[in-house]
Amino acid sequence: MKARLLVLLCALAATDADTICIGYHANNSTDTVDTVLEKNVTVTHSVNLLEDSHNGKLCRLKGIAPLQLRKCNIAGWILGNPECESLLSERSWSYIVETPNSENGTCYPGDFTNYEELREQLSSVSSFERFEIFPKESSWPKHNTTRGVTAACSHAGKSSFYRNLLWLTEKDGSYPNLNNSYVNKKGKEVLVLWGVHHPSNIKDQQTLYQKENAYVSVVSSNYNRRFTPEIAERPKVRGQAGRMNYYWTLLKPGDTIMFEANGNLIAPWYAFALSRGFGSGIITSNASMHECDTKCQTPQGAINSSLPFQNIHPVTIGECPKYVRSTKLRMVTGLRNIPSIQSRGLFGAIAGFIEGGWTGMIDGWYGYHHQNEQGSGYAADQKSTQNAINGITNKVNSVIEKMNTQFTAVGKEFNNLEKRMENLNKKVDDGFLDIWTYNAELLILLENERTLDFHDSNVKNLYEKVKSQLRNNAKEIGNGCFEFYHKCNNECMESVKNGTYDYPKYSEESKLNREKIDGVKLESMGVYQILAIYSTVASSLVLLVSLGAISFWMCSNGSLQCRICI
């Protein structure tokens, strides 16, 4: 018995088989991603898809400076408010910048009809030609073109008027009917502006236009309207009890616009031949202009990023990432990062992919660790690693390309009478934004789940590749490792790694070693059987003696009576 036990212990102590393990890369990365099933999964490599930083500056867009309206707004600029005179020389821009507190708009009080629509039209204009549509001196010879000034539009301490409009008044005590027209020969849309004056009393009406009842008629192929002045006393605004209403239209190439009036016309002086450009827009910002270039501008600052998403601002100009409400959009490209404890088991095997990754393998994602008489070491499987890198890179690029629809997103304008429409529009925009955010987050969650499963599958495939080569020349010992039944030097190990392992060459040696191990197992089984028999007999004897002693004690004190009946 002692001899058999000694054989078993010696066999176990002498075992020092060659081993090969399959595992994957690990590092000191702290990147975390989310998947459909898990939150904050630590991974070896990942890419960020969400831009959350800007430079806080206004920059040139693709080398072209923006039009800064400074203290003026769109109305003051396009009508020619005297306080906005410095803007008259501007001809082209990449985008238009208003400030939140711009104060110079319509200097003479009144309504600007369809002003929000005009802003929308101008948001797509990148340049224009400002030209005299009706020359001041020759177009209105029977009317006064110089006395139409007001303290409401003062400039340098003197009464003045809009630089793009003419306030026509009586001349030599007369205001004859006027009839003038313009044919658009510019080859592009022309923006034409005019106004109608509404005096506060009949006296002013007669003084300015020499008649109590007047009209203004404006006609083109797509515009036809007749205006009648509304004479009424009103609260003073900017010192004026009268009002001027402002109007505009876009004149198509070849179209004609005709003006007919017998009073109260604020006539066009300058008009604008518009050139539209992709990527232009209007933003409201307090940021200052700097010497910098960008492809994407927001009211908060410029974004220089190729990422598909941003959470900085929903209003953007240029080639910009899509705005989402997310705070994190990170796509995994590597593997789960679970560095294993580099402990050695009974046979000295390094823990494999079941327990964690290997920080010692730095030249690939998947690979091997071997140990034999010549030593031990890591080696990456370059083919499977490269195939995985190519596949994941293509996937990431595809996701970025599909989601990276860069565009301008400007805010919509509504007047005070369109509050319900504005609220509805905000709800619709919020709904679309929620959908975009949900789609982006769901896409990343799904792709992260697929990528991690893809890596797990690649490790398993590599394991099955080794297993199919070794067959019964080695045994699985767990942790992604195999223990050879034969000696496997470095050349042998290399053949396993590159798929050229010669199974027949080592099968005889493996068979003999396998039989020896099986014999030891059989001997040990005999030892275990003898021990089991002895243990059973001894336990039975102890039980019988115990029962006899208890019975004798109980009979002696009368607790148990024994009767034998014949």
From Swiss-Prot:
**In which organism is this protein found?**
Influenza A virus (strain A/USA:Huston/AA/1945 H1N1)
Instruction: Outline what the protein does.
Output: Binds to sialic acid-containing receptors on the cell surface, bringing about the attachment of the virus particle to the cell. This attachment induces virion internalization either through clathrin-dependent endocytosis or through clathrin- and caveolin-independent pathway. Plays a major role in the determination of host range restriction and virulence. Class I viral fusion protein. Responsible for penetration of the virus into the cell cytoplasm by mediating the fusion of the membrane of the endocytosed virus particle with the endosomal membrane.
Where a lipid (S-palmitoyl cysteine) is covalently attached, the residues are 555, 562, 565
Record's bilayer topology term:
Single-pass type I membrane protein
Q: List the disulfide bonds.
A: 21-481, 59-292, 72-84, 107-153, 296-320, 488-492
- Which cell locations does it reside in? Virion membrane; Host apical cell membrane
Q: How does it assemble?
A: Homotrimer of disulfide-linked HA1-HA2. Interacts with human CACNA1C.
Q: What is this protein called?
A: Hemagglutinin
User: What does the further note read?
Assistant: Major glycoprotein, comprises over 80% of the envelope proteins present in virus particle. The extent of infection into host organism is determined by HA. Influenza viruses bud from the apical surface of polarized epithelial cells (e.g. bronchial epithelial cells) into lumen of lungs and are therefore usually pneumotropic. The reason is that HA is cleaved by tryptase clara which is restricted to lungs. However, HAs of H5 and H7 pantropic avian viruses subtypes can be cleaved by furin and subtilisin-type enzymes, allowing the virus to grow in other organs than lungs.
Listed under GO cellular component are: host cell plasma membrane; membrane; viral envelope; virion membrane
Q: Name one GO biological process term.
A: fusion of virus membrane with host endosome membrane
Q: Which residues form the signal peptide?
A: 1-17
Q: Does the keyword S-adenosyl-L-methionine apply?
A: no
Gene name, per UniProt, is HA
